[in-house]
Amino acid sequence: NESIRYFTDILDTKVFTHIFFSICRILNREKKGFSEDSISEELQKLVTKDYSSNISKATCNRAISWLYFSGIIGFCAKITEMDILDFKSASRCYFMDMGLANYYLTRTGTDSRVLAGTLNENYVYINLKKRQDFPPEISFETPAFATYRGGEIDFLAQSLSSSTRYLIEVKAGKGTASTAQKALAQGKADKLLYLKGATKGGIDGKTETLPIYLLEQYKFN
């Protein structure tokens, strides 16, 4: 096992599984980012609380760094109150592989409704991350979610070619997004993009609804 070379204790190597489960629980709960100051601190708090208090902060940090630089997890930024100058680069993390995400989310006992929503959101994260690789299509160094007036918007993206700002909401069912609608109405963005699993799609003014499986073909112009 390649990772074992970086860790000296059996507790160290088990931290990977603990981190995966903790990521799932964070993704499944309603939140505005981590309660701690960093991904490492939030995950360490969960890992030591739920699994073993013997796992050190240094071990947790090493494991998270290894997972990130190996392309197994990715970080998501937080934009507070739709202000792109208030940009916190690592406020959430996602899996970079949908099979891995499905496996661990299922093992945490996630019910089917929540599972579908979380997997859809993870899929959109991966798609946005690819659009920031060369040649980049959208702004920011990582995908980002946003907060606004006490609510949360799944993702915020901005076109590099036109500076058009998109609010992106990922819905597994027929839900609406009141926070995103409010931000759009108050001029905080140019468009609202709904990505849904069961829809034929359509355009209503500045709001566009798209079947999530067509996201790969969508262009942020």
Give the location of each predicted region.
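Short, surface-exposed beta-strand-loop junctions and turns on beta-sheet-rich folds
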Residues: 110, 161-163, 174-175
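Catalytic cores of nucleic-acid endonucleases
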Residues: 171-220
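A structural signal for isolated positions on well-ordered beta-strands in alpha/beta enzyme cores
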Residues: 144, 166, 191-194
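Active-site beta-strand-loop-beta-strand hairpin of nuclease catalytic cores
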Residues: 157-167
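Sequence-level motif detector for i,i+2 pairs with an aromatic at +2
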Residues: 90-91, 163, 190, 205
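Accessory nucleic acid-recognition modules appended to NTPase machines
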Residues: 1-153, 157-159
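Short, glycine/charged-rich beta-strand-loop motifs at protein surfaces that mediate ligand recognition
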Residues: 113-114, 167-171
